[in-house]
Amino acid sequence: MTLTNHILNISPPQTENQEADNGYCQYDEDFYNHYLECLGNYLLLSGSHNISLSNGRFQIKRDSYTHLQQQLEVQRMTEQDQVWDKDKIRQRHTKIIDYLMEIL
């Protein structure tokens, strides 16, 4: 049996709906240019987990992030408002870079 992992965009390239309640920030030009492919917007998941989540609402994704520390980190970061936005992506990006610089 082979276990396959995927790198998931927490904010997907396309969402199933563009309503404000989908749990993501507005996808403006700044978001596409600086946040969509940002390290802080990536998450490691099993292949089957990634496929099951697709481009769905953030709340559904968030509730499924229960296995790895990095998944639990996203849950903790969104406890108050349960929205994945530019500020949280930037915070997570900085935290990952700081950690990498510390161990290198």
What does each model-found stretch correspond to?
Residues 1-104:
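Flexible coil/loop and intrinsically disordered segments
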